[in-house]
Amino acid sequence: NMKFMEAGLFAFSAIIGLVWIFSVQSIPAADSYNIYETASQTAQGNYAFLHNGSDFYNKDFYSGFSYYNCYPFQLGFVLISEIVYRIFGTDSTMPLQVINVLCVAAAYLGIAKITKQIFGRNKIEFIVILALAGCIQPVLFCTFVYGNIIGMCCAIWASHFLIKYFQTDKYLVLIPCGVLLVVSALAKYNNLIYLVAFVIMLIIHTVKAKKWQSIAFALALCIAVVGTSNLVIKSYASRANTELKGGVSQVLYLDMGLNESYMAPGWYNNIALSLYTSNNCDIDAAESQAWSDI
């Protein structure tokens, strides 16, 4: 009975995750702490962290600029966190850790269902469920209050609905697909990679199956995902009565990635942020210097 196995996988992952987060009692740090501070304060009507010169975690790295002048895309997860803190209170990140646990369990369930969609064989899904039950790394990651897990979960289920559309041509399943992808990109902006993948698949489907509505959905996805992120940024800027810059760009990250890191090969270094802030958050000047370095 695969439905029983799927339910068992969800319950097992959720129980292990809940035991873990309540045993460890982790607290946020680094970017996670900045987002916690901002979300918990905005939930109480305080928008000071969005202004330059504000007192926030590791503020010395930002040369007096607001964290969100450098990384405005983080406001997507700030919005999600703020909603949670308005409902459950601002004293702890534990509500978001619980949501992380449920999202890991839901993501595992989504992977199992996608396996069934693609292969159509209970035996293969059974093997995948057993493998997922033994994969505890994402469960241990639930103490990290960031957008990774929520974004991953939403992207996996968006993939499930997109595959369902390809297999059934039922247009209504594109609605949850689009909504979940928007939430995924808000939680973790890196999940734009899913948008790219979805658009490519929809274009191929358009050409192969002559389903021209697929290309319309691809266009709608791009507008919804990118537009919602920009709308959230503008909303917070308006609420805080301030102006937020465009932030560190992909060109600066490319320059950063080509340089050595003080942490580990291929890992983070301060070059992208330093270029941006040293040019007074002028992205054109910063990118010009980055291209010269590249």
What is the role of each PLM region?
Residues V173-K188, F198-V199, A220-V225:
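Membrane-interface alpha helices of multi-pass inner-membrane proteins
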Residues F119, I156-V173:
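Membrane-interface transmembrane helices that cradle and orient dolichyl/undecaprenyl
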Residues L140-G151:
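Short acidic/glycine- and proline-prone juxtamembrane loop motifs at membrane-interface regions
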Residues M94, Y108-G134:
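Transmembrane-helix signature of polytopic, membrane-embedded enzymes
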Residues G8, G17-F73, S81-R86:
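Extracytoplasmic loop-helix module adjacent to an early transmembrane segment
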Residues Y47-S63, A237-I294:
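Membrane-proximal stem/loop segments at transmembrane-domain junctions that anchor or position
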